[in-house]
Amino acid sequence: MVSKHGTASSAQAKAEVDARTESRARAMLDEAASLAPASTNGDAELADQLSEKARVAWTKNGLLIPSTKLAEEWGITRGALDQAEEGYEVFLLKIRGWLWAPAVFAKLKRSAVAKVCRTMPSADEVSKLFFWMQPHGALGRKTPAQAIQAGQLERVLEIARGLAEENGWGHAEAN
């Protein structure tokens, strides 16, 4: 039986699986973005349907995990996760009546996720998800999660602040 922390080869295998999952997630985000029609009143219903279809796909393909799983991974109660969401420390997506969280959050410290999420409190959930999943040139083509894992939290915060300022998403608190 392999220990919880595994061996070097199991760590490498997990890293490869994580990389493939992240690659599929980016492809899904790109596909969803290409399907989204221009926003007009006549297209609003179609956009909602496409958005819902994409969101359901994200739950099936591992981009999102149930919020209860994130709470468990972070060692907190579901109520504490709700409070974190109210404090802009995390964001959740409601899909078909259930709350889902970005799977990458489970790989990161709660405090790091909170610092980044608080920089853009008024951004919509999909914009936040795209921020977390897209590689950024300023991060050496890494996603914010990859950059944080590589010790670049401060750089991720700089980029998040700039994006929030550019889009008028405001700040919940100074970081």
Give a label for each model feature:
Residues 1-175:
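Non-transmembrane "mature" sequence context
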